[in-house]
Amino acid sequence: MNTFESIAARVSVRDFENRAIPRGDLEEIVSAALYAPVGMKRYDSLHITVLSTPEEVAKFTALARAQIGDPHADPVHGAGALIVVSGKRPDEHTEYANAACMIENMLLAATDLGLGSLYVQGAVRAMRGSAQEASFRALLNLPEEFTPIGSAAVGFAKQKAAPRTQPQNDVTGVDYIG
């Protein structure tokens, strides 16, 4: 698949099969994150944690359910893996942009490998300052200086989505000057 095909084919999947992702696929996906542009080349300000089995992902889901008070919530929709990007400077806009670039690369790599994906930020961010924060950090085995920013849920989609046509968006315009 070429870059534009991957971009068009990538959709947010919210219904995954409950099975593990092959380690080699996860390694390729993480490798794509490492090619992402990062402001001022501060790669050392970022950390990636891979919850690589459905059992580990289920632990995250349990923490998220406890945090939001909904025993049925599933912010990762049964994904087989969750790849969390953390930063040393979580309150800086650049750190969010860096994490977003890494996550987008991973979402596109997952698509290229025939896997489904979903950008998950809200449930990750909700853990900050919460009663579940210590348990979440322990699950991630996260060094103290890092704070989770966002994540990519990855898995086998129960249904394959057709590539999208170019979206028409009345809110955002494109102006070519000159």
Question: Can you say where each PLM-predicted feature lies in the sequence?
Answer:
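Small-aliphatic-rich amphipathic alpha-helix that forms the alpha element of a beta-alpha
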Residues: 33, 91-136
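Short, charged/polar surface micro-motifs in flexible loops or helix N-caps
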Residues: 53-58, 89-91, 158
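Short, conserved aromatic-histidine micro-motifs
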Residues: 65-66, 133-150
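Helix-adjacent hinge/juxtasegments
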Residues: 66-104, 108
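C-terminal helix-cap and adjacent tail motif
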Residues: 5-6, 12-13, 17-18, 142-178
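Structural motif
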Residues: 80-83, 116-118, 150
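Solvent-exposed alpha-helices and their adjacent loops that cap or buttress functional pockets
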Residues: 40-43, 74-77, 140-146, 165-167
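N-terminal amphipathic, basic helical "cap/leader" segment at the start of enzyme domains
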Residues: 1-81, 174-178
